[in-house]
Structures are given as structure tokens and as C-alpha cells.
Amino acid sequence: SFNRRKELNMEFTPEITENVKNMMQLTDDALKEMNLLIKGPREQQNMNETFRIENEINSLRNRLKAENINNVDNRKYDYALGTMYIDIISECEKLGDYVVNVVEARLKKNG
């Protein structure tokens, strides 16, 4: 999406840029938490923080998708830009899902 945006010479609005930064910060937080859980002893770990971050990511994604529909409808920016924007948001959300999968696998108890 970033490459496509550059190829088409499209600029994100300041609001979109800020929203993407916020989502990327949450995914970065999720990755950092995952790394902490992977390094520590399994018996001393829990998934509470991982789930909290994942819930924040999902909530932000849902809010941004709804806002995007309104912004495109109100011609704040065009459909192509809105699609690229939401593609990036969706990819970040998928990364959050993958983090949860890794943490669940790491903390799964045998037997």
C-alpha cells in the first residue's frame, strides 16, 4: 500500500498519517510484549497484556474503518486513498492476530 500510494503520487491527509502512526505504535507494543513473553520462563507468563493490546488494535481498526467510510462519503479524500489507508490498517491488525497466535503457542502447556 505504501508503494502503491507512492507510485500513484497520493498523499495521506495529516489525520490518516496520525491514525496509521497510532496503529503502528500499537502493533509495535504487541511485538515488544510478544518478545518479552518468548524470552521469559513460560510458568511466569500470562497473556493479559497481549489480549489488552489486541483489543485496542481491534477497537482502533473498527473505529478507523467506520470513519473512513464517512470520510470517503463526505469527499474528505477519494476512494482509492481510503482503500490504501484501510489496507494498511488491516495489515497491522493481522499482525496483531499473529502475535496472539505466537504467544498462545508459547504459553500452551503440554498435556
What are the language-model segments listed below?
Residues S1-G111:
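Cytosolic, long alpha-helical scaffolding segments
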